[in-house]
Every structure is written in C-alpha cells, then in structure tokens.
C-alpha cells in the first residue's frame, strides 16, 4: 500500500530537515506558512520569517542541530500527524524528546505546522537563547 500524498510530503520534509536540505524544506512550505514551535506563544508567519529564525537566509548554521527519527505518519486530504523522537545538540550538550507534529496541507504545500512534546519546559530550558 502506498502512502497518501500528504504522508509522503511529511516524510520528505522530515528527510530534508534531517539532511539540512533547506531548498527542499522551503519548497514544501506555503509562502504564508504559520509555524508554531514548541514552547512559543506566537507562530512564525511566512517563509522569510521562518528562514530568518533558522538562519537559512544567512547561510550560517544555527547554534544547535536537531534530527528526528520518524515513527509514524497519519494523513488525510487536509492534515498529517507525524510522531517522532528528536535528538538535539547544542553547546556540547544533547537532548532527546518525543514530538508530535500536525501539518495543515493545501494544494501540496504545508500551510501551518503545530508541534507538541512531552516536556515543553525541558525543551525551553535546553534551547534557551537560541
């Protein structure tokens, strides 16, 4: 059985994220993306603002690295839910956490993303200042 097209899109953006392929990541996002991060009250709105947040516009690497091991993707015509374990490194420290991501998808592009975890406070503490 083949993946739903939106599940395949979620898998592709996960692979692009893990490999640092910012072009593939940007191609998967709508220009007016709403990006909701774990532990942040306000979303990042727009591809340009998201690129600035992650340093993609400067060419400089971010002060941390994150990869995710995808466990499952559930999809329909409007949404995907991805379950993963994230592995982060920052300033010589490492941190693993579970994450659920929900994508709203329209016309083959991710228009909104929400991320949730089992320990928001630990995530905020780890990434403080980033």
Language model regions located:
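Hydrophobic pocket/interface hotspot
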Residues: 10-13, 24-29, 33, 46, ...
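A short hydrophobic beta-strand element
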Residues: 76-86
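A solvent-exposed, acidic/Ser-Thr-rich amphipathic alpha-helical stretch
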Residues: 22-78
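Short, cysteine-centered beta-strand-loop-beta hairpins and adjacent loop/turn segments enriched
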Residues: 60-63, 88-96
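Short beta-strand segments enriched in hydrophobic/aromatic residues
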Residues: 29, 86-88, 101, 117
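Short, surface-exposed coil-to-beta transition loops
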Residues: 66-68, 95-100
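Short, low-complexity N-terminal intrinsically disordered segments enriched in polar/charged residues
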Residues: 1-31, 126-130
């Amino acid at each position: 059985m083949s993946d739903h097209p939106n599940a395949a899109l979620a898998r592709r953006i996960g692979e692009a994220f893990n490999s640092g392929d910012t072009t593939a990541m940007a191609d998967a996002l709508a220009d007016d993306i709403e990006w909701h991060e774990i532990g942040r009250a306000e979303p990042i709105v727009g591809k340009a603002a998201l690129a600035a947040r992650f340093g993609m516009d400067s060419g400089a690497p971010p002060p941390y690295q994150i990869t995710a091991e995808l466990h499952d993707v559930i999809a329909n015509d409007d949404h995907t839910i991805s379950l993963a374990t994230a592995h982060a490194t920052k300033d010589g420290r490492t941190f693993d956490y579970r994450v659920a991501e929900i994508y709203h998808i329209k016309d083959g592009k991710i228009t909104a993303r929400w991320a949730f975890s089992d320990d928001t406070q630990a995530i905020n503490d780890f990434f403080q200042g980033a």
